[in-house]
UniProtKB/Swiss-Prot annotation:
Gene Ontology terms: cellular component: cytoplasm
InterPro entries cross-referenced by the UniProt entry: Aldolase_TIM, DeoC, DeoC/FbaB/LacD_aldolase, DeoC_typeI
Domain of life: Bacteria
Pathway annotation: Carbohydrate degradation; 2-deoxy-D-ribose 1-phosphate degradation; D-glyceraldehyde 3-phosphate and acetaldehyde from 2-deoxy-alpha-D-ribose 1-phosphate: step 2/2
NCBIfam families linked to this entry: deoC
Cellular compartments annotated: Cytoplasm
Catalyzed reactions: 2-deoxy-D-ribose 5-phosphate = D-glyceraldehyde 3-phosphate + acetaldehyde
Family listed: Belongs to the DeoC/FbaB aldolase family. DeoC type 1 subfamily.
Name recorded for this polypeptide: Deoxyribose-phosphate aldolase
Length: 223
């Protein structure tokens, strides 16, 4: 089970004060444990891509992070730049305010701006920031992500008021159906919580506690 879970983990370091030495360590751990990817801020994509060259570990980065309040054009440029630097997966934050305003056209256009640039080059995961949404908004966000061509929906940035819950994961899985990925992130710190997310329907886990999870320990990070 540990090895299977390792292949579902995006080994994550998104804090503002991350140093090169920490990114190097992250990549070494990802190689050692066989994680699906490392998830790093855009400034570290080229470094991580170089460190992981010739391995199965992908480089994942974040777009419009963590607020999602950039314009679609900005998110599209961030995506293009990240892919050019070696990103194979991008986790973008939706325009949460637009969703709450009922401006579904803008939400969809915003996601599509990233999807269009990434098509055939990188997987797109759409962060809905579930902790800020009502049930109806969570469903609508997932529906818009699917409509815009996303590969995954993702619960949280890990930088807002809450992280992943099995209930949100189950709702997201029910909404998107079997063919779209669901990523649980934020507060997944041990094997028990990781397994709960997977049982609820998650196919990827975003966490900075990947090593603790596969070693059966508990970490104390929020992401």
């Amino acid at each position: 089970m540990e090895n299977n879970i390792a292949k579902m983990i995006d080994h994550t370091l998104l804090k503002a004060d991350a140093t090169k030495a920490q990114i190097v360590k992250l990549c070494e751990e990802a190689k050692q444990y066989g994680f699906a990817s490392v998830c790093v801020n855009p400034t570290w994509v080229a470094t991580a891509a170089e460190l992981l060259k010739g391995t199965d570990v992908k480089v994942c980065t974040v777009i419009g992070f963590p607020l999602g309040a950039n314009t679609p054009e900005t998110k599209a440029f961030e995506t293009k730049n990240a892919i050019e630097n070696g990103a194979a997966e991008v986790d973008m934050v939706i325009n949460v305010g637009a969703l709450k305003d009922g401006n579904d056209d803008l939400v969809e256009r915003d996601i599509r701006a990233v999807v269009d640039v990434a098509k055939g080059k990188a997987l797109v995961k759409v962060i809905i920031e579930a902790c800020l949404l009502t049930e109806e908004e969570k469903v609508r966000a997932c529906q818009l992500a699917v409509k815009a061509g996303a590969d995954y929906v993702k619960t949280s940035t890990g930088f807002s008021t809450g992280g992943a819950t099995p209930e949100d994961v189950a709702l997201m899985r029910k909404t998107v159906g079997p063919n779209i990925g669901v990523k649980a992130s934020g507060g997944v710190r041990d094997m028990q919580s990781a397994e709960a997310m997977i049982q609820a329907g998650a196919t990827r886990i975003g966490t900075s506690s990947g090593v603790s999870i596969v070693e059966g320990k508990t970490a104390n990070s929020n992401y």
